């Protein structure tokens, strides 16, 4: 998996889902993230903790800005002191390499 972020190649109908044989490797690169499945669709998600709502909202807005840069958007749930980020590729109904790259970007924003 590359650290460079392509435009939303995961949004193409012919984009390939992550090879199941590589899934553990990708997950190991974002160890705080967990694999989920909803209605047969694999996703990765993580809860981030903050001291207050303002900091949670600031993080949400930063993640939203990077999502807008490449037109690939996560599910974001913002609460007092917590943000849950969930990535998957809607078009292919599953995980693409881009989802893991975006999870790494979220980590960079959080740790900045």
From Swiss-Prot:
Q: Name one Pfam family in it.
A: Pterin_4a
List the catalytic activities from the record.
(4aS,6R)-4a-hydroxy-L-erythro-5,6,7,8-tetrahydrobiopterin = (6R)-L-erythro-6,7-dihydrobiopterin + H2O
- Spell out the InterPro entries in the cross-references: PCD_sf, Pterin-4-alpha-carb_dehyd, Pterin_deHydtase
Class of this enzyme: lyase
Q: Alphabetically, which GO biological process terms does the record hold?
A: tetrahydrobiopterin biosynthetic process
Recorded GO molecular functions are: 4-alpha-hydroxytetrahydrobiopterin dehydratase activity
Q: Per UniProt, which keywords does this protein have?
A: Lyase
Q: Name the family the entry cites.
A: Belongs to the pterin-4-alpha-carbinolamine dehydratase family.
Q: What is this protein called?
A: Putative pterin-4-alpha-carbinolamine dehydratase
Highest lineage ranks of the organism?
Answer: Bacteria, Pseudomonadati, Pseudomonadota, Gammaproteobacteria, Oceanospirillales
């Amino acid at each position: 998996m590359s650290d460079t972020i392509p435009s939303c190649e995961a949004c193409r109908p012919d984009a390939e889902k992550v090879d199941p044989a590589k899934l553990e490797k990708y997950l190991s690169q974002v160890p705080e993230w967990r694999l989920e499945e909803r209605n047969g669709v694999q996703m990765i998600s993580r809860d981030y903790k903050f001291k207050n709502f303002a900091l949670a909202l600031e993080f949400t807005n930063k993640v939203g800005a990077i999502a807008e840069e490449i037109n690939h958007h996560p599910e974001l749930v913002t609460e007092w002191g917590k943000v849950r980020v969930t990535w998957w590729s809607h078009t292919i109904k599953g995980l693409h390499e881009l989802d893991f790259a975006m999870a790494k970007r979220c980590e960079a924003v959080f740790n900045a």
